Amino acid sequence: MPGLIIDKDDVCFYVTEKCNSNCIMCPMSLDSRKRGNHMNAEEWKSFEESIPGNVSHITITGGEPFLCYERLLPTLKRINLRYPNADILILTNGRALAVSRIMDQLKPLITDRYCFAIPIHGPNEDLHDKITSSPGSFRESITALHQLTDTPARVEVRIVGHKLNLDRINDTLHLLCTLHSRIDVINLIAMEMTGCAARNREFLWVDYDVLCQTAEKGIQYAIMHGIDVGLYNFPLCQVPERLWPLVKHSITPSKIMYSDDCAMCSCRDACGGMFYSTRLLKLCVVKPFGKGE
């Protein structure tokens, strides 16, 4: 449900369940994306006013937050005034940023404290639009990356890895390197196995180690081009040790689960674990490191 999650000086403002894409591996259900809730005006105002004064990081997410752009844009203006030192991360598919009337209103609000995280699912329109089930979405998301070039914002691209795009992961990374001046960070993301991802797991799931090994050439290529690369949602035992510096503790603490076998692992404290849903579906066999390793 839409709402506000406060964790010390970190806030997540979840503004809507609805989305204008229909990604096959979305961790939300189709029903929530198509018939879910926007906040009403009273709820929105109440949650916005509940953001604490000492906040250092604000994440705005959905669904697709720019489906609520008429409320979101004034909120961003107020956030800029009230929390000038807070970093703002906006998780968006970017499609609305290809619309001139929205982008023209958004651009004056963007400061160097902003970061936009936009998913790109493949190196071309055919694959990306197949995954989003939304014709034209690739063109719109790429347009968003170009539009953000003229702003002081940082730009992050997220690639969610699965069987449908596994063979084109390196091509996707190469494409993003051609947009180097527009991209600061690329994060390769392992799926959260809930919602549509869980329902479609038989033809989506790919083992963590296979995903890492397949993408490694493209990852190294991106790093050589000066782009920061991160690995999200990967247990350390599934990642080649040479890529460990890229692994992020990215899973919300309430969603993390460790296998019983992880208790004996010498690297447990350094590992971000796996999603509870992944463990529940028995999709990963962990490989604990011995105390002497």
Spans of model-derived segments:
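N-terminal [4Fe-4S]-dependent radical SAM core
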Residues: 1-12, 53-54, 242-250
